[in-house]
């Protein structure tokens, strides 16, 4: 095996392992965030049964659906997240070679910064093409609030994908893809671009204290998450439409979704669950730091 292939494999494994650990740890926060985001577009949650906020959601989920339901959709998330994050990290370094080859970070700061933004954004968009149906299934499984099998919309990952594919075809599994690409480029560009730029400006980037590294990652994750959050809300609402027919369809398209959320629910609706997203982001920051640590040992 060539050095380049070995390096790619190391990136893939280090990123995937770090991601799977942290994602399982923050799965309950992730589910709360998703329910707050999509409940307005859910057929299972009537207006009077909607969650009032994070605390209400955390209290009611175990009562109504059982404690383990906090991890509903987590298996799909781990399966999805392993290739997503691993591909992001692996492609990021490949794209960095393309965008940053021969760029001096101290003498050409803005070119260095732009190259980092481009490599982070391109990595996110590329990996999204491969794993979008898994992301879609994870969202629909997490949004499923039925208690027993009879009340559930889907029995599991395979059932969700086959049901939607039979109903809507491949298009149903890629519902909201366009706005996802827009959001992921913004998020990944900040997530990787600002993180790498900040680390690169330190005197000795290879030997950064883990606390400093975590603080940089924490800030980057929170900012990136908030900036791209409205795109995430719209894409999840669009995902909730797959499998619906006729009068059940709430939005005619992405633009209509943006317009209706703003008009009917107000601008705040774009940020429903955003606070839990910041908390969840601590896991994202942990992934970046853990990835750097794992790479030292492989």
UniProtKB/Swiss-Prot annotation:
Its main location: mitochondrion. The matrix-open state (m-state) is inhibited by the membrane-permeable bongkrekic acid (BKA). The cytoplasmic-open state (c-state) is inhibited by the membrane-impermeable toxic inhibitor carboxyatractyloside (CATR). Proton transporter activity is inhibited by ADP:ATP antiporter activity. Keywords: Acetylation, Antiport, Membrane, Methylation, Mitochondrion, Mitochondrion inner membrane, Phosphoprotein, Repeat, S-nitrosylation, Transmembrane, Transmembrane helix, Transport. The modification N6-methyllysine is found at residue 52. It is a multi-pass membrane protein. GO terms for biological process: adaptive thermogenesis; ADP transport; mitochondrial ADP transmembrane transport; mitochondrial ATP transmembrane transport; negative regulation of mitochondrial outer membrane permeabilization involved in apoptotic signaling pathway; positive regulation of mitophagy; regulation of mitochondrial membrane permeability. PROSITE patterns: SOLCAR (PS50920). Signal peptide: none annotated. ADP binds at residues 80, 92, 235. It holds the Pfam family Mito_carr. GO terms for cellular component: mitochondrial inner membrane; mitochondrial membrane; mitochondrial permeability transition pore complex. It catalyses: ADP(in) + ATP(out) = ADP(out) + ATP(in); H(+)(in) = H(+)(out). The modification S-nitrosocysteine is found at residue 160. Under cell death induction, transglutaminated by TGM2. Transglutamination leads to formation of covalent cross-links between a glutamine and the epsilon-amino group of a lysine residue, forming polymers. The chain crosses the membrane at residues 8-37, 75-99, 110-130, 179-199, 211-231, 274-291. Solcar repeats lie at residues 6-98, 111-201, 212-297. Residues 235-240 are annotated as: Important for transport activity. The modification Phosphoserine is found at residue 7. Residues 38-74, 131-178, 232-273 are mitochondrial matrix. It comes from the Eukaryota. One of its GO terms (molecular function) is oxidative phosphorylation uncoupler activity. The keyword Acetylation applies. ADP:ATP antiporter that mediates import of ADP into the mitochondrial matrix for ATP synthesis, and export of ATP out to fuel the cell. Cycles between the cytoplasmic-open state (c-state) and the matrix-open state (m-state): operates by the alternating access mechanism with a single substrate-binding site intermittently exposed to either the cytosolic (c-state) or matrix (m-state) side of the inner mitochondrial membrane. In addition to its ADP:ATP antiporter activity, also involved in mitochondrial uncoupling and mitochondrial permeability transition pore (mPTP) activity. The transmembrane helices are not perpendicular to the plane of the membrane, but cross the membrane at an angle. Odd-numbered transmembrane helices exhibit a sharp kink, due to the presence of a conserved proline residue. This is ADP/ATP translocase 1. It comes from Bos taurus (Bovine). The lineage of its organism: Eukaryota, Metazoa, Chordata, Craniata, Vertebrata.
């Amino acid at each position: 095996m060539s050095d380049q292939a070995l390096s790619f494999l190391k990136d893939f494994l280090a990123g995937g392992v770090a991601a799977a650990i942290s994602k399982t740890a923050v799965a309950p926060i992730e589910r709360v965030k998703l329910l707050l985001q999509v409940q307005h577009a859910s057929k299972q949650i009537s207006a009077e049964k909607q969650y009032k906020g994070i605390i209400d959601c955390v209290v009611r989920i175990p009562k109504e659906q059982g404690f383990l339901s906090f991890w509903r959709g987590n298996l799909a998330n781990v399966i999805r997240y392993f290739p997503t994050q691993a591909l992001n990290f692996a492609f990021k370094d490949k794209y960095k070679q393309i965008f940053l080859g021969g760029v001096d970070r101290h003498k050409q700061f803005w070119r260095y910064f732009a190259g980092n933004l481009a490599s982070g954004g391109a990595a996110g968009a590329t990996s999204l093409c491969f794993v979008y149906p898994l992301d879609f299934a994870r969202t629909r499984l997490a949004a499923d609030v039925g208690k027993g099998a009879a009340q559930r919309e889907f029995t599991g990952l395979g059932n969700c994908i086959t049901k939607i594919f039979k109903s809507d075809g491949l298009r149903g599994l890629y519902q909201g893809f366009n706005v996802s690409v827009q959001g992921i480029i913004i998020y990944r560009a900040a997530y990787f671009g600002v993180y790498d730029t900040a680390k690169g400006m330190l005197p000795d980037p290879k030997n950064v204290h883990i606390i400093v590294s975590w603080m940089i990652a924490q800030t980057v994750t929170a900012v990136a998450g908030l900036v791209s959050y409205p795109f995430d809300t719209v894409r999840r609402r669009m995902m909730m439409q797959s499998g619906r027919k006729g009068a059940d369809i709430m939005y005619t398209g992405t633009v209509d979704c943006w317009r209706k959320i703003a008009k009917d629910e107000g601008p705040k609706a774009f940020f429903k669950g955003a606070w839990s997203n910041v908390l969840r982001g601590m896991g994202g920051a942990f992934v970046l730091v853990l990835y750097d640590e794992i790479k030292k040992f492989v």
